[in-house]
């Protein structure tokens, strides 16, 4: 019975982890959340938007924390992180994935040259405690780089 239930949940794009169920997020969901965040910065200003992005119970943390907005500046300093407030104020410029890839540097470079983009890297999925590929969409707004990622 349990295997049939898990199979049925998998068919509907859901994850079951430690007794919790939620719909798996898509790259389109991540991009839409970044677009919504960019609109808030433009409409309300940087300070108000950053406060909202850092609100772990706010509109920019979704699907039980699977989707959240993070913001870095051009130097790699974290200005907002809806999932981990301990990162705010920390410089993540030299952060690498398990394969040694400097994915934050890549985001900064692409944002500076193209204004927006995607980057893929391996990261620990806290929900499953496994290393997985993650794809992050980001956009540059003034001196901010606003991003949101999903596990593949």
Enumerate the predicted regions with their spans.
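N-terminal membrane-sensor/transducer module of prokaryotic signaling receptors
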Residues: 2-152
């Amino acid at each position: 019975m349990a295997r049939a239930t898990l199979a049925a949940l998998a068919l509907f794009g859901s994850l079951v982890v430690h007794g919790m169920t939620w719909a798996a997020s898509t790259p389109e969901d991540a991009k839409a959340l970044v677009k919504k965040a960019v609109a808030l910065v433009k409409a309300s200003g940087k300070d108000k938007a950053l406060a909202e992005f850092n609100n772990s119970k706010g509109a920019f943390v979704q699907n039980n924390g699977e989707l959240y907005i993070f913001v870095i500046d051009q130097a790699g300093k974290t200005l907002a992180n809806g999932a981990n407030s301990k990162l705010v104020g920390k410089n993540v410029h030299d952060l690498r994935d398990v394969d040694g890839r400097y994915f934050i540097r890549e985001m900064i470079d692409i944002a500076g040259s193209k204004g927006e983009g995607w980057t893929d890297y391996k990261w620990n999925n806290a929900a499953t405690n496994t290393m997985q590929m993650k794809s992050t969409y980001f956009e540059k707004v003034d001196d901010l780089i606003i991003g949101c990622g999903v596990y593949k």
